[in-house]
């Protein structure tokens, strides 16, 4: 039996502590906040998208950074293992669109309560309001921790599960990165990810609050396509957000360091250029004397129609029967490729996750143990791993935490 200290009471830390205790170790979970799962509490807009019920091949395809590093973690703890654990812990789950898994109650607090019960039942000592400042090592192995109040606690194994840099108000202030660096670990460059983006165009701000459904969103760096998907997005006072944009941000954030990127919205992806042109011809021929500025409301929401009229460059007072073939072709092109310029991503305060973290080449993938410091383990967002939206990032936390708890000897 080993004496184990887990630093961080988020998803990864709670899972690591639970598994280590179930395997017979004496476990102390240290959390600097006044309660466990503070970031977990706000995930999924307070509903907590605990995992995704897709097959593992699909889940692997949604991992953006270092997917191969996670094979052993997923083997140790799959999405079905997580769902079974939570439901057996007294929290019923449901599966929604996109195979996203939520508590039936739609309350993230029920997930945290479930883990709190499981931790107490397994004998984990939970100490809140305790901030770890340093990890103590002796002869190249983890030996304990120093606390902000000056106290020290000895241990045979240390689990670092302090999260990334997103939502700093929940305690994710980079402590784990600093402690890892102090022990010789490399922390890769970090960026906000799954985050809204700032755009150059003023017309975006004119559409603030407008949500688009069933559109295709594409981002390019010159001619190179970086991202393309179909779904929903939202215009804001600073640019764009919504599921498509959040996912795109994870694929483009590193490129934005160097330059602006071009984005395009296909407002009518179900129609080819020819079909859209035929639709416009039909609409225009039915109301020949209508002014162009009033002719697009059947095709787009009113606020968007107004901006498309302006962007088209066609005289808004022109009667639709006078619109030329060339003008119509430009309108089709605009509808199928509405252009935007992405300037930057928003800050960590608006980011769901952090991209970047402890370099995985310095961590044993089969155990999550440090290759540099014996008895030191890593779990969750602290590592250089991340995925797209849909419950995948929490699955990374559960799986890496579980593997740590099962690997400590």
PLM feature spans:
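Glycine-rich FAD pyrophosphate-binding loop
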Residues: 21-45
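Glycine-rich active-site loop/strand segments that organize a redox cofactor
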Residues: 47-95
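An anion/pyrophosphate-binding glycine-rich loop and adjacent beta-alpha core
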Residues: 34-42, 50, 56-57, 186-191, ...
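Short hydrophobic core segments
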Residues: 5-7, 30, 132, 152-168, ...
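Feature captures the FAD/FMN-dependent oxidoreductase FAD-binding
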Residues: 75-157
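A glycine-rich dinucleotide-binding beta-alpha-beta segment and adjacent secondary-structure elements
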Residues: 127-129, 134, 306-386
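Glycine-rich loop(s) and the adjacent beta-strand/alpha-helix scaffold that form part
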Residues: 157-203
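N-terminal Rossmann-like FAD-binding beta1-loop-alpha1 element of flavoenzymes
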Residues: 3-29, 404-408
């Amino acid at each position: 039996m080993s004496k184990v200290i887990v630093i961080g009471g988020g998803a990864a830390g709670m899972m690591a502590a639970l598994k280590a205790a179930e395997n017979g170790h004496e476990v102390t979970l240290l959390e600097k906040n006044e309660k466990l799962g503070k970031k977990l509490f706000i995930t999924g807009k307070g509903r907590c998208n605990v995992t995704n019920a897709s097959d593992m091949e699909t889940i692997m395809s949604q991992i953006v950074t270092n997917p191969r590093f996670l094979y052993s973690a997923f083997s140790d703890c799959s999405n079905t293992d997580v769902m079974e654990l939570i439901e057996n812990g007294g929290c019923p789950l449901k599966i929604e669109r996109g195979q996203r898994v939520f508590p039936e109650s739609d309350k993230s607090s029920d997930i945290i309560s479930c883990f709190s019960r499981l931790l107490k039942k397994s004998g984990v000592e939970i100490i809140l309001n305790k901030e770890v400042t340093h990890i103590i090592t002796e002869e190249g192995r983890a030996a304990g921790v120093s606390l902000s109040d000056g106290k020290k606690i000895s241990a045979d194994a240390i689990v670092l599960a302090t999260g990334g840099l997103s939502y700093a108000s929940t305690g994710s202030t980079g402590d784990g990165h600093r402690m890892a660096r102090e022990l010789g670990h490399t922390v890769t460059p970090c960026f906000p990810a799954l985050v809204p983006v700032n755009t150059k165009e003023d017309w975006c701000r004119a559409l603030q609050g407008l949500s688009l459904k069933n559109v295709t969103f594409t981002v390019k760096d010159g001619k190179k396509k970086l991202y393309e998907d179909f779904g929903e997005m939202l215009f804001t006072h600073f640019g764009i957000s919504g599921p498509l944009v959040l996912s795109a941000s994870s694929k483009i954030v590193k490129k934005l360091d160097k330059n602006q990127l071009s984005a395009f919205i296909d407002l009518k992806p179900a129609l080819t250029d020819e079909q859209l042109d035929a639709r416009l011809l039909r609409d225009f021929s039915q109301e020949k004397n209508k002014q162009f500025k009033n002719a697009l409301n059947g095709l787009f929401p009113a606020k968007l129609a107004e901006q498309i009229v302006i962007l088209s460059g066609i005289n808004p007072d022109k009667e639709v029967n006078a619109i030329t073939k060339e003008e119509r072709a430009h309108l089709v092109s605009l509808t199928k490729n509405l252009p935007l310029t992405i300037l930057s991503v928003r800050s960590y305060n608006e980011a769901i996750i952090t991209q970047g973290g402890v370099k995985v080449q310095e961590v044993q993938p089969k155990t999550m143990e440090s290759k540099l410091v014996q008895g030191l383990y890593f779990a969750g967002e602290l590592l250089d791993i991340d995925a797209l939206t849909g419950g995948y990032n929490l699955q990374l936390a559960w799986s890496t935490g579980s593997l740590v708890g099962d690997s400590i000897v």
